A protein has these predicted regions:
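Cysteine-centered catalytic environments shared across enzyme families
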Residues: 1-166
Length: 166
């Protein structure tokens, strides 16, 4: 029996533990994901963003701002102590006003602190930024045409049906 099957068996026998699996987690992927079954069990928030699916655990927060051809997503909590910005939507709007990858953009994103991941979609391309201290872990994998970004490496394995190397 694989570790994944062992976990599924425990969660089938103790459904009250399902909300603890990948607590505060997120997944951002263009894969088809059934959020009703393991590992989500219908407990996660889901949202279609461009060609991607965003799944966020019930303990986590996320924010989305659209600006012309760009979509800005912030998962977690961010704060800009230099501009005294603590509202994540305001922070995303401020980033969206800047030309992507300009000096002003880099200045703003480098001023952020907190526990977060920022995802910026421009067309079909996704740009991923983690908080400076990596308090919010961010893992990714590409398998064929499938892109998967997540807070948990094992969650990517679950979605892509990959077994973890020992």
């Amino acid at each position: 029996m694989t570790k994944k099957q062992q976990i599924q068996e425990v969660l089938n026998n103790h459904p009250e533990l399902r909300g603890k699996l990948y607590e505060r987690g997120f997944v951002f992927t263009n894969a088809d994901v059934n959020e009703k079954i393991y590992p989500f069990y219908g407990l996660w928030q889901t949202r279609k963003i461009g060609a991607y699916n965003l799944l966020v655990s019930e303990q986590q927060r996320y924010y989305v701002v659209e600006n012309s051809d760009k979509i800005f997503v912030l998962i977690g909590h961010a704060y800009n102590p230099f501009k005294m910005q603590c509202d994540e939507n305001d922070i995303l709007h401020s980033l969206a006003e800047k030309e992507f990858a300009s000096d002003a953009f880099w200045s703003d994103i480098n001023e952020l602190t907190g526990v977060f991941t920022v995802i910026i979609l421009i067309g079909e391309r996704a740009f991923i930024f983690g908080d400076a201290s990596c308090m919010q872990t961010t893992f990714y994998n590409e398998k064929g045409n499938i892109v998967c970004v997540s807070s948990h490496a094992n969650l990517i394995g679950d979605i892509l049906n990959e077994e973890r190397d020992e």
